[in-house]
Amino acid sequence: MGTDPLIIRNNGSFWEVDDFTRLGRTQLLSYYLPLAIIASIGIFALCRSGLSRYVRSAECDLVNEYLFGAQEERKEDNSIERLLRNSNTQANYVNVKKQGRILKLRHFDITTIDVKQIDAKNHGGLTFSRPSTSDHLRKSSEIVLMSLQIIGLSFLRVTKINIELTNRDVTTLLLFWLILLSLSILRVYKRSTNLWAICFTAHTTIWISTWIPIRSVYIGNIDDVPSQIFYIFEFVITSTLQPIKLTSPIKDNSSIIYVRDDHTSPSREHISSILSCITWSWITNFIWEAQKNTIKLKDIWGLSMEDYSIFILKGFTRRNKHINNLTLALFESFKTYLLIGMLWVLVNSIVNLLPTILMKRFLEIVDNPNRSSSCMNLAWLYIIGMFICRLTLAICNSQGQFVSDKICLRIRAILIGEIYAKGLRRRLFTSPKTSSDSDSISANLGTIINLISIDSFKVSELANYLYVTVQAVIMIIVVVGLLFNFLGVSAFAGISIILVMFPLNFLLANLLGKFQKQTLKCTDQRISKLNECLQNIRIVKYFAWERNIINEIKSIRQKELRSLLKKSLVWSVTSFLWFVTPTLVTGVTFAICTFVQHEDLNAPLAFTTLSLFTLLKTPLDQLSNMLSFINQSKVSLKRISDFLRMDDTEKYNQLTISPDKNKIEFKNATLTWNENDSDMNAFKLCGLNIKFQIGKLNLILGSTGSGKSALLLGLLGELNLISGSIIVPSLEPKHDLIPDCEGLTNSFAYCSQSAWLLNDTVKNNIIFDNFYNEDRYNKVIDACGLKRDLEILPAGDLTEIGEKGITLSGGQKQRISLARAVYSSAKHVLLDDCLSAVDSHTAVWIYENCITGPLMKNRTCILVTHNVSLTLRNAHFAIVLENGKVKNQGTITELQSKGLFKEKYVQLSSRDSINEKNANRLKAPRKNDSQKIEPVTENINFDANFVNDGQLIEEEEKSNGAISPDVYKWYLKFFGGFKALTALFALYITAQILFISQSWWIRHWVNDTNVRINAPGFAMDTLPLKGMTDSSKNKHNAFYYLTVYFLIGIIQAMLGGFKTMMTFLSGMRASRKIFNNLLDLVLHAQIRFFDVTPVGRIMNRFSKDIEGVDQELIPYLEVTIFCLIQCASIIFLITVITPRFLTVAVIVFVLYFFVGKWYLTASRELKRLDSITKSPIFQHFSETLVGVCTIRAFGDERRFILENMNKIDQNNRAFFYLSVTVKWFSFRVDMIGAFIVLASGSFILLNIANIDSGLAGISLTYAILFTDGALWLVRLYSTFEMNMNSVERLKEYSSIEQENYLGHDEGRILLLNEPSWPKDGEIEIENLSLRYAPNLPPVIRNVSFKVDPQSKIGIVGRTGAGKSTIITALFRLLEPITGCIKIDGQDISKIDLVTLRRSITIIPQDPILFAGTIKSNVDPYDEYDEKKIFKALSQVNLISSHEFEEVLNSEERFNSTHNKFLNLHTEIAEGGLNLSQGERQLLFIARSLLREPKIILLDEATSSIDYDSDHLIQGIIRSEFNKSTILTIAHRLRSVIDYDRIIVMDAGEVKEYDRPSELLKDERGIFYSMCRDSGGLELLKQIAKQSSKMMK
């Protein structure tokens, strides 16, 4: 064995010319390297105990979270419970603030949720992945091969064969392999990621080192045969071992896998090998399945345990409890991931520059005519080095981006989860915004949805922006350093240009951020307005406001587009700077070199410099764009932060828990809607001292606007407590409550006046996630009078009721809401006027069998009602309110003794037949009878599937396969047609030709060997620079070359900016036309479209999809065209230089085609699923915000938070695997690109005699560009196609069935010459039949009746009889199957819809108000003067006659604070939430009175108003509309008993039609029985008789 150092060639050096020396191979590779690895293993072993504890703790964090749930939080809860039970604190009702804080945490804090048991359902479970037979075989092979290596080294050590290694080297290697074998054996018995990582890292390092002596053997630098045999043997062993290592699972033994209980296939991410992780092969099976079958949501694999939103939010909340700044909290949560990402960025940036350095060395060899064989060896080494660098770059780039995507996914989950939780816990009623707050966030529904749909996604993408930004900064620094190394002082010229560009780019980025903020503000306004319109689409259609609203939204849209135009201008300037900067930097640098330093350029230096400046171009562009994106994200982050900083509900602070948990009372309590209301005369509940009777029926009575609903909200903690106290029995979360022996819990249930329902089945709305008890459920159905309704519904209680219960009548919605409250286990039930929406039959049944029936035994019921005559019986306690104060209270007997109730209201008529004529025992109609009778405001449109399985809401359409050419043609039509596209292509091609011309011009310059340096005026010593040679005579002046170079670059930059502007202008034109077209189509769609399409889904089109077309589609279209033309030109250029490359290009094209096809197929479907799974998030959020008061009343916040997280996870699954598919594709494209560089360099070397260094530089430079260009072409086209998915989704709405606004073509009547139509108001219905869908049976059958001009007609009947459907037909929301409706003799089907609807006025059952002011709601389009508005308000008793006189006598705007309705600019909250329902209804009636219609329709318009106000309104109708025809649907028979005629409907048919007095003569008639069951038969007879006499 050789030991003599004298025989070592070039003693003391590790490298000579083209290879490692013997010293390098022996000492560096065979001694120092193994020794360093052994030392590292030893150091790790010494620190093992501490490290293993840390690693094990980190690894088991989530496992412990699953196994032990929220035990720590329970400990804190238990401490509070002990505090509550402490007698010392009972006297003071506990520390309210601390109690409130803890209670709020228990309701809303995600950390309090036990993951193992969520609402009696597991979230998921842990399982183990066991090693397979192949895994065991790999381990055995690994041990055998290492043993062979040890045997070989031992043989060398014993036999002392003479090789170039010393005994010391062999001994070190032997020790290294023995340690590695010991660790491998230990891994068999002990599961440890650390041991696997040590073995893999050590072996990979040694394996790489064995390539060096093998190369020495190959090029003949190792002469002795024994050494050759040893190195070959070592290389074979390590090379055989390496695939085993690469394909072994990262964790040797069993791996923990988290499996969801929804049967989702678990993620393969953590059970894959290192090779699979590096190459992303673990997703290949999924991508392959996507080629065979269309991907559905159920086919997408699950996430890793740590990527499920519940674990993300738990960790985020726990780590950041004491951090109030959202930005700092996010940074604190992801600082480790950010650090890892930055490390990948650093390695990526360095490796990215190595090919350019190697290319310079390669070109120097090509440029040297006296090349030796050693130089050729180096040239091949450089080409192989470039190939390896490209492969390494592929790994680094994909892994770094993957870390960013992980952060993006988790930030998205955090932001949506936090915004949702904030929406649940925010204060409902806040002070109005002042003018100074105009720029702050307005937390209406549309804005909050915008925060989720746009802002949260922009902020989540910040991780990717930061990754690219840091990469760009590092690249710029390193490139500048290399330029200085190659060019010397002249590099500072280029650096100066860059430094000048930085402030410009930063300024432009700030401008983009500013315009983005303006754009988002306009987008908020547009989405809010549109959302409000869609939520109330029926009101819009009734009043024919479509065109007005379209104009309003278009006006906002125009402002939005102006902001986008400003952004486009800035983008164009940015594009110009991007193209011109490399030219300026390169040209100025070359000018300094030639004119100042008096040196000539050669090909290696010129093309290396050019390549470096090309590399510099990308990070400069990225830096500018990323700064812009970061600014946009900053704006979005601030908007989210502002929303999250809004006030939380004070419910848990201002409600006091009774020590004995058995009290509900107000103690000297004063409450307001707004905490800091500056109006001292604003409505308040003042000085309340009420003690409700526990376990009894308590009534809250009073006139409209007296504060009845407000009192219930105050009891629920939703109003602001100014003084006093409110005592309640409990505030525990629903799922922490323990039932008593009767199955009841000490909690509240709430039924609001406007029924709030989920878009779900009837059954699920009633069960409301309580334990299902079939017997109790059936009793509740019966008690609430729903039995017959469920028999009629197509799928019974499994029928989907649609968004906001769209398929149900008002009475059905109210009864389902009541059933939910009664079915709950709550001991205390709050009912807000739940009897007003049902007919007299049903009201009696509900009161006797539900409210006072056995289901309410031992339960407290607090009932707000106007139906005094019905509810006084069996009630125990009553409170009478007047103007926010308690007028009277006491037991019913006490109040009657005071003469409070008039005898006619409390006298109850006999109900002997009630058991025979109850709400549920009426015979259900035949199957061919009416399936569902709708109220006017709530129409149903069934389809065949709905009839069969009860499903109403159609699943969102998802196209399969590639985007249809029709979609591209549709978009191109708006874009400007083929002419615009051809013109743009011409601009792009011209710009690319100019770009290539610059490289050819440089080659022409450097090949001119006689360039003179003619720079008089410069007197600077020449600096010695590598690669530069002096020359005294030139063919052309250097100034000539520089001038042409600058000229080409500037023209190219101007074209670049111009083409960007033209592309954006064309895109904005398309975006504007698409939006206008979509808006017109949606608002003029048939009502059936809104019944089967959730508003959240429509809003997703108008928010996310429009935003995609506005701001994402065009930039991707621009760069896709750019890359396409770039790749085509590069292939042509390289083929001209090296024709052999054409063969490689064909092979590469085939590879790209198949890889791209696989990628596009999978990514396209995943992108579509990503888009589709966003809609349920928005829809669920919209539903939650509307019903937040009910959710909080039930204490059911946790379940809704968890449901939101489930929907986030659905979306994140699609997003995550889309991002992984992108990594799979980009790695393979980068790998193919690496082979392109290798092939290009090889062709140059094989044809080196015929290629000069200039052509070689162009060929190699563009080969590298082709790699990046091809990668970005497919990726950008894929992203462009994914964004075209938004266009596809928008195009789907282009085929929405439209209402026939101009009437039927045949015999159309526009009535343009009759502006006063109708003159008389005569209505004639002949043989009318109606149905909701073509494939459904009629709901109205052969109805005929005639209404004389100026007559008053009442329409009565049981809930669901078809009353409101008749009204709907008058507005042509339903078109007749047979028959017709005539008004003044004109068939309304032939009349223009706008004319028809503006000629009829409706006052619907649900009072709908829009966010704004009193004036904007009463007179939205400034058609009337203020005095007329005040007159209408006076007519409905919202202002008194005295106040109206004051208004008439006042010449200035009247702003009295004594009555809010005297100030027409009083703010109205969205939905009118700051008014009582009665006040909302009166305001709506005032709106209708202004129109002075000839025909007025009232659909339960006074159901939510007290009897006195009802009587007043009826009087107004009779006096003010004495020349109008009136049709009134009423459950209060008193309201219509004095009408001219009564229509009695049942099962879609007219059963009775006559004068009320005549109908009451028939004791067997339906009307008679209804009057008898109402409790005032004699009184009704008397009124009808008097009315009949007056008419005679």
UniProtKB/Swiss-Prot annotation:
Which keywords describe this protein according to UniProt? Answer: ATP-binding, Glycoprotein, Membrane, Nucleotide-binding, Repeat, Transmembrane, Transmembrane helix, Transport, Vacuole
Limits of the ABC transporter domain: 664-908, 1323-1572
Q: Which GO terms describe its cellular component?
A: fungal-type vacuole membrane; mitochondrion
Q: Which residues are glycosylated?
A: 11, 370
Q: Name one GO molecular function term.
A: ABC-type xenobiotic transporter activity
Q: Which domain of life is it from?
A: Eukaryota
Which residue ranges does UniProt annotate as crossing the membrane?
34-54, 75-95, 101-121, 132-152, 171-191, 330-350, 380-400, 466-486, 490-510, 573-593, 615-635, 990-1010, 1052-1072, 1116-1136, 1138-1158, 1230-1250, 1253-1273
UniProt gene name: VMR1
Question: Which ranges make up the Cytoplasmic topological domains here?
Answer: 55-74, 122-131, 192-329, 401-465, 511-572, 636-989, 1073-1115, 1159-1229, 1274-1592
Q: Which family does it belong to?
A: Belongs to the ABC transporter superfamily.
Question: Where does it primarily localize?
Answer: membrane
Its name, as the record gives it, is ABC transporter ATP-binding protein/permease VMR1
Identify the species of origin.
Saccharomyces cerevisiae (strain ATCC 204508 / S288c)
Q: Which BP terms does GO give this entry?
A: response to metal ion; transmembrane transport; xenobiotic detoxification by transmembrane export across the plasma membrane
Q: Where does ATP 1 bind?
A: 702-709
The UniProt entry, under InterPro entries, shows: AAA+_ATPase, ABC1_TM_dom, ABC1_TM_sf, ABC_transporter-like_ATP-bd, ABC_transporter-like_CS, ABC_transporter_C-like, P-loop_NTPase
- Domain named ABC transmembrane type-1 is located at 338-632, 981-1282
> Where ATP 2 is bound, by residue?
1357-1364
Pull the Vacuolar topological domain ranges from the record: 1-33, 96-100, 153-170, 351-379, 487-489, 594-614, 1011-1051, 1137, 1251-1252
CDD domains hit by this protein: ABC_6TM_VMR1_D1_like, ABC_6TM_VMR1_D2_like, ABCC_MRP_domain1, ABCC_NFT1
Please name the Gene3D superfamilies in this protein's record: ABC transporter type 1, transmembrane domain (1.20.1560.10), P-loop containing nucleotide triphosphate hydrolases (3.40.50.300)
